[in-house]
Amino acid sequence: MIVYGDRAETVASRERIAALAADIDAIATMPPGIWRHDAIVTAFVALGQVVQGVADADREAHGADGGSDAERSLLAPLTALSQALLASWDSDFGDITALPALTAPLGLPDRITLRLPEGYAFYAVYPEAYAAAARLLRLDGTALVIGVRSIGTGLAALVAAVLGAPAPVTVRPIGHPFDRTIALTPKTETGLIASDRHYVVVDEGPGLSGSSFAAVAAFLEERGVRRDRIAFLPSHGGEPGGQANPRTIARWAGAQRPVVTMNTLLPRERLSEWLSHLIGPVEEIEDVSGGAWRAYVYGSEADWPAVQPWQERHKFLVRAGGERWLVKFAGIGGEATRKLERARLLHAAGVVPEVRGQVYGFLVERWLDAGAVGDNDDVPDFAGRYLGARARLLPPPGGGASLAELAAMAQYNISVGLGDEVAAAFARFVIELGAPESRVRRIATDNRCDHHEWLRLSDGRVLKADALDHDAAHDLIGAQDIAWDVAGVIVEFDLAPTAAERLIAITGEAAGHPVDRDLLHFLTPCYLAFRLGAAQLAADSLGGWPEEAVRSRAAVSRYAGRLSALLTGQAGTENLPA
């Protein structure tokens, strides 16, 4: 199934470096404390992206990773930022080392493509955890650090700083997602291999196959490096997933691969201290990640919606000063700050809960004693007001999948999930309707309009939960026309035609422009196919959580039934308005 996608941004390299240099200069004027540390980490993440973009441009030009002069020049200030980050963290945010004077190096490409480091944005990967893990390594020889781009670029510089190693080498594995390889220029390869070195490979993961770590290890082993001289620094302590080959599994089992988890890095006492800056002394913290929040919304487990526990953001229910707050990971490297600005816009419009602020990657939002929303007559009213406000207030911060890409995703998922006959019906549907790309008005769409994402308060009002970042999630969709969310509400609440008409009208009025009906018709089967794929992947990955797998399989059945009915023309099963 096609579900995941990567986020990329192409920028003018010198302009980005100049802006980043100003940000670094501003850090020097900040007082000690967690906010200065946050700013250092934000600059560290941003400069890591720039180095990644330069390295990728060089690889594209030469067909192999070679460590261009521009990349090597930028690794020096990245190392200096790493040292400042370490000094700040180790001194409880009191001290920092000298900050670099950042300038554009010679040989810099005019434009570079920056990849979003997914671990920083989605999976609570903190660079300090890698520093702590690096200190647990037992090395036999001089350390040489290899960072796997994207996120491994900055992390490798940080680990090299911890180990007192020379500047790292960065690589971009290529090939089939489950069987990747790396290629280095002859000069870089010659400088890399030496018998007295202990190699440290840095990346997030491992994922389904562990192929990125494996690609680097295989390259080294093929050139005579012993396995016991190759260590890994991953983001979690688990094994590679079900697509890993036997060699990768054996290599992983025997390697040094220390991990420091977020819970170890951020014990409750440390998190409580940070939060006290926003909400006062903390009385209690309860972890409600992995779907545990459902116990506070639903009376019975039988009513719990499906979740994918390992993909949920870390979140805590916090009590302070007699009030309760939801503290949720929103991303480091400036991600949480950007989402805070969005939350304040939507709260001012009266459609989401109050957000108090952010503290080093966590948003602090007022916890509401609210219940689940049923299939009530007012769904078009509260959903239309919310979607219209979103369309009016939130232009897209980045791009999203084109209609052609959505159609290709849907075609594939339908073929895999429902068979060739229904896939052929979708192909005819696309030909008949066309893909009116020129009519798409991209906004920062919600992309999660499920039943359980809405909160009904005791006074009858309904607010939208989890409304801040799914347009930039680790999936294909991205920013879309508001018709995508309209389709989502119609599908998730199974709206009758008259209710769907009301939703369309209210959304258009609140947005200031009508909902495009042709787009709505085009996007509805695409929405269903995407959710079918996501539910199927969730069900397939939940072998260790059988009760969650049952819920995901029920979602698969629901989306498959709706999609099949829509495309094969079974009357009375699809409620889109005419």
Kindly give the residue locations of the regions a language model identified.
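An alpha-helical support segment within catalytic cores of ATP-dependent transferases
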Residues: 396-447, 457-459, 552-572
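Helix-rich C-terminal or lid/interface subdomains of diverse kinases
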Residues: 487, 501-572
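Conserved protein kinase catalytic/activation segment
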Residues: 453-465
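Conserved ATP-binding subdomain of kinase catalytic cores across diverse folds
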Residues: 297-429, 460, 467-529
